[in-house]
Amino acid sequence: MASIIYSPKDIFEQEFKTSMSGFNKKEVDEFLDNVIQDYETYISEIEELKAEIERLKNQNTHPKSPSTENRHAMVQPTRVAQSATNFDILKRISRLEKEVFGKQITE
């Protein structure tokens, strides 16, 4: 992709040297050629960006795979369930230890 040569400020501030019959025609022609090239570059960039916007819109309306999203959503509940199960096991062990060791202390 061609690079942009002039900014709007550059175009606004451009001054041409004058010759006997007015501005130097060669300098003005070169400047205008570069302006035309810039506009062609802008048009090309705009078209590429429009195409990318369309591609992203289509990608957004057609998600990759619902199973991928569900897989990530399922990870959290699985961890919570495992934590709850581990907590229940620890409570049972604690209760059993109290029963076993509590009886030994009284005997």
Curated annotation (Swiss-Prot):
Its subcellular locations are: Cytoplasm
Q: Which residues form a coiled coil?
A: 32-65
Pfam families per UniProt:
DivIVA
Q: Which Gene3D superfamilies does this one have?
A: 6.10.250.660
Q: Where is this region: Disordered?
A: 57-80
Tagged with keyword Nucleotidyltransferase: no
The cellular component terms of Gene Ontology attached to this UniProt record, alphabetical and capped at eight, are:
cytoplasm
Q: What does this protein do?
A: Divisome component that associates with the complex late in its assembly, after the Z-ring is formed, and is dependent on DivIC and PBP2B for its recruitment to the divisome. Together with EzrA, is a key component of the system that regulates PBP1 localization during cell cycle progression. Its main role could be the removal of PBP1 from the cell pole after pole maturation is completed. Also contributes to the recruitment of PBP1 to the division complex. Not essential for septum formation.
- Describe its assembly: Forms polymers through the coiled coil domains. Interacts with PBP1, MreC and EzrA.
Q: Which family does it belong to?
A: Belongs to the GpsB family.
Q: Output this protein's name.
A: Cell cycle protein GpsB
Q: Which gene is annotated as encoding this protein in its UniProt record? A: gpsB
